[in-house]
């Protein structure tokens, strides 16, 4: 009788654990109000986005180039390769100076509906001369 009672208690413990783990699993707590969701680190009001550190109003927000915590430095060198299908719908606007040294090449079919226009001027200078980079206003 004692072993039967012990077995019954073990079965009940497994059932209770199974029932409560469905409602309060690690994923449910983290996704709703834990570290990665809700008001946690990756939330709209946490460190990841919204009003947090990486937010538009946070440290990496709307700052001039070279002033924000995560602002683009303006200096870069290397190859960029994109493979696969790139369906693009809508409007893409790039404002400001975009210095490009090298060549831009499309291989294969590029289907576009609508109009594509590039306006502005292209300078071959890059870096602090044009006000980009870390501490740009102090490097003149």
Curated annotation (Swiss-Prot):
Intrachain disulfide bonds: none
GO terms for biological process, alphabetical: chorion-containing eggshell formation
Superkingdom per UniProt: Eukaryota
Annotated source species: Lymantria dispar (Gypsy moth)
Leader peptide range in chain numbering: 1-21
Annotated function: This protein is one of many from the eggshell of the gypsy moth.
Protein name: Chorion class A protein Ld2/Ld41
An annotated GO cellular component: egg chorion
TM stretches of this protein: none
């Amino acid at each position: 009788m004692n072993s039967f009672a012990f077995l019954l208690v073990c079965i009940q413990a497994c059932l209770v654990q199974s029932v409560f783990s469905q409602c309060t699993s690690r994923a449910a707590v983290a996704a709703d109000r834990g570290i990665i969701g809700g008001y946690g680190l990756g939330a709209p009001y946490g460190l990841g986005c919204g009003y947090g550190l990486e937010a538009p109003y946070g440290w990496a927000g709307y700052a001039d180039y070279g002033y924000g915590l995560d602002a683009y430095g303006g200096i870069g060198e290397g190859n960029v390769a994109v493979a696969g299908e790139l369906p693009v719908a809508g409007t893409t606007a790039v404002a400001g100076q975009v210095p490009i040294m090298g060549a831009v090449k499309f291989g294969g079919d590029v289907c576009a509906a609508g109009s594509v226009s590039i306006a502005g001027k292209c300078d071959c200078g890059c870096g602090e001369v044009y006000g980009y980079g870390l501490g740009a206003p102090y490097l003149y």
